Structures are given as C-alpha cells and as structure tokens.
Amino acid sequence: MNFGCQNMVDPLCKVLIKHPRDAYQNQTTVNHQSTQLNYTGVPNFEKALADYESFKDLLESSGADVHFLPGDESTFLDSIYTHDPCIISNGGAILCAMREKERLSEPGTMEAYFKSINIPILGRIISPGMLEGGDVVWIDEYTVAVGEGYRSNAEGIRQFRELLGKLVNEVISVPLPHWNGPDRCLHLMSNVSPIDHDLYLVYSRLLPVSFRQYLINRGIKLLEVPDEEYNSMGCNVLAVTPRKCIMIEGNPVTQGRLEAEKVKVHTYDGSEISLKGAGGPTCLTRPFLRSTA
C-alpha cells in the first residue's frame, strides 16, 4: 500500500510538501498577503527559498520520499503548511474544512494531487463542520485525539469519527483554550508533539488536565517545553523515526531535554518559513505513509 499514516512516529516513508516558490510565488505576493494573514513579519522570499531547501534536505536524508504539491493560483501563502488541509487514514485521505477563507481551496488541491498518485479519497468534512490536520494527534493506530477549538469544531469531529468508522476504536475530543483568540492559530499540535510511542513533547500550560493525565496513564513520558521557547515553536517537532526528529533552531533548552532522552535532533532555520507564519516542521509536512518495517 502506498499510503497509511495512523501514527506519528514510525519511519516517515512518503511526505507531501509545498515549496515556497509555489506557495509564496514572489516577494510582491509575500508583501501583500503576509499582513492579510496576520503574519508576525514579512518573510524574505529569497531566504525562504534557501531555508526551505535545507529543510527539504533533512526530510530526504531521513529516507523519506518527498513529493511536491504544485502551485495553484487559488491558494495563499499559508498553503506552504500542507499538514492542515487533509488527514491520511489507512482508508484514504480525509479532506478537511478550513476555518480561514484564504485556505478554503487548499483541500481541493490536495484531492487533485492524491488522485493523481492513486491515493483514494475516503471523504471530506462539510460545513458547518470544521476540521484541520493540526488538531489531529494519533495516539496509536486505533486511537486519535482531536483538538476542539476555533479551527476544528464538534461537528467536524463528529464527521471525522463517522468517516473513520471501524478504522479506529476511539476518537477523543480535546477542548482547546481561547488563548490569543480566534484570529491566532492554536491547534492541538501547537501543544503536543509525539517523539516516540512512549515520549511526547508538550506545553502543559495549554493542555486540559484530563488529556494530560490520559497520556500519563498510557505510560507516555511528557517532556516539558519551557515558557521562553513556546513562541519560538519549541513544541512543534516532527518525528521522522522514533526518537529522531526535526525542529526549529534556537530552542536550546527543549533540544537539550530531547537529547537527554537519547533523541537525535536535526534543526533548520525557521525564521522565514516557520516563525513568521506560525507553522513549524509538522505544519510544513503532510506525511502520507509511515511504516513499522
């Protein structure tokens, strides 16, 4: 099978990304759209291209087969964050329903690409449901947690559960806080990054007590991200194999805590492609095949 991704730590075999040359297009487009999309700064287009090449190289050196989502005139800068518009189940792709109007066309571009490589579409979330990939955390192959907040709502989670059917045993709804409001992106994965089946990186101050305790009761060790490294996206880390990950450089405390747990850490410069648009290495990638083999 050329797809299947109901876990977040087994070896990354196939991943879909979108290069900034296609998502950003040029500096003029970046200048215009970054304010519209509430970016914290205006990305430098040329530096973004160079930094993304380094990020792509890390993915390829991990052994992943890297696929590129083509450019599309209907999409905006945020289309670089390919994790959000769809979810890959063992039954096919589930197309999400995005909250922001600038991202509404993105699931359709995912659908076209996956169909072109013969990956089935299991279904789609429809209004009034909302669901974004950044809110979905696979605890194991048959257990998935979904953040319920401003980006994914109860109706979206209900539809997701219905589409998955017998592919899972449990879908856990995790309430998210208001934090900085509906115009700022907060996903469940803003606060949780699986590093191994029994090791998660977390920012506990934004986790519900019940969900945090649930993880502990499952025997998962929680590594805490310090306050000073939360805004620099220290909690957004992509596992490419168990205990081998990619993270944004400039989070030395978090990196040290990972390395103390025998985690191999690779870093990249996220100043343009991650920090200004609030999308770390998990956001930049849509894994669509992980394998235990």
Can you say where each PLM-predicted feature lies in the sequence?
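The feature marks the mature, well-folded catalytic cores of soluble enzymes
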Residues: M1-A293
